């Protein structure tokens, strides 16, 4: 069972980490330290974990729903999840190695990291404004998401 409170808590943690990291990565000297690296991979783990929870628990009922609009929305979010994971893996392959951040070009790193943060934050906003209300409407439960 997954509650909306759990999903919102995960999203809140992701947003907090992205805000802190956004500030920290601006200073090149702070990018290579262990604390920044730990925070960065905590962010990565939180995002991956959140998407995995949604993939495993939220979409099945929506994909099997009789209303085509509900199915379509579920397919869009599932597709978006796959795309975010693909972009994430590409990003990690470029900038990380065995849970270490490898920065050759700080400006490019900052830009691509900010783009990734924006992608994830837009996803969180879409979940909050579209997906979670749809699940509440379809299930009739304002507390349990799946």
Region annotations inferred by a language model:
Residues 1-146:
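Small-residue-biased structural context
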């Amino acid at each position: 069972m997954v509650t909306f409170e759990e999903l919102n808590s995960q999203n809140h943690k992701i947003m907090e980490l992205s805000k802190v990291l956004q500030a920290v990565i601006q200073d090149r000297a702070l990018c290579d330290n262990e604390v920044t690296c730990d925070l960065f991979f905590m962010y990565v783990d939180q995002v991956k974990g959140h998407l995995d929870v949604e993939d495993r628990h939220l979409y099945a009922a929506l994909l099997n729903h009789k209303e085509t609009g509900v199915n379509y929305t579920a397919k869009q979010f599932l597709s978006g999840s796959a795309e975010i994971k693909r972009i994430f893996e590409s990003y990690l392959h470029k900038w990380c190695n065995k849970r270490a951040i490898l920065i050759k070009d700080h400006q490019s790193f900052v830009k691509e990291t900010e783009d990734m943060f924006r992608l994830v934050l837009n996803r969180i906003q879409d979940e909050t404004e579209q997906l979670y209300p749809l699940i509440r409407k379809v299930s009739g439960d304002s507390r349990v998401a799946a």
